[in-house]
Amino acid sequence: MQGEGYAIPGQVALVLAMGGDHVVAHLALYERNVLLDGEPERMGLIGGVVVRADVRRQGVASRLIEAAHAELRRHGIDFAVLFALDHRHYASAGYVPMQNETCFIEDGHVRRFVYRGGMVAALGARRWTTALLDLQGETV
């Protein structure tokens, strides 16, 4: 990885699935303050989802995502976002493709486009909008 990364002002968690004393799967979860249609919104971002090959197709990733969603709800967060090339793995967890134009800073330059790998899950009663999503800063 190059660059200095970016600051995460909210809570951070690593969700692990254990097989005995070995990690068999994990995901990273953090909160991020963004603007959605110009209005402040705090949302959860999920990334780094990895499941060891010999325990795949056993619902391990689904249980990790359920745990991450529960943690976000506990913090009063209504939306979880992730970026994935293959949407099939996340649809069963309630994720749908995002249609939002997304603004962020990458390598010191402002980027703004619709990223077709973005997915969102509504964790409460509020509905997601297709308005501009401004990530308010750097991404990795």
Where are these regions (language model features)?
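A short, internal acetyl-CoA/4′-phosphopantetheine-binding micro-motif in the GNAT/acyltransferase core
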Residues: I46-R56, L85-D86
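Conserved active-site alpha-helix within GNAT-family acetyltransferase domains
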Residues: R74-F79, A84-V110
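Conserved acetyl-CoA pyrophosphate-binding loop and the N-cap/start of the following alpha-helix
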Residues: V55-A67, I77
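Short loop segments at secondary-structure junctions
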Residues: G19-H22, D54, A122-R126
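A conserved beta-strand-loop-helix scaffold within acyl/acetyltransferase catalytic domains
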Residues: M1-V50
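C-terminal "cap" of GNAT-fold acetyltransferases
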Residues: F104-V140
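Short acidic (Asp/Glu) patches
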Residues: L29-E31, L64-A68, Q99-E106
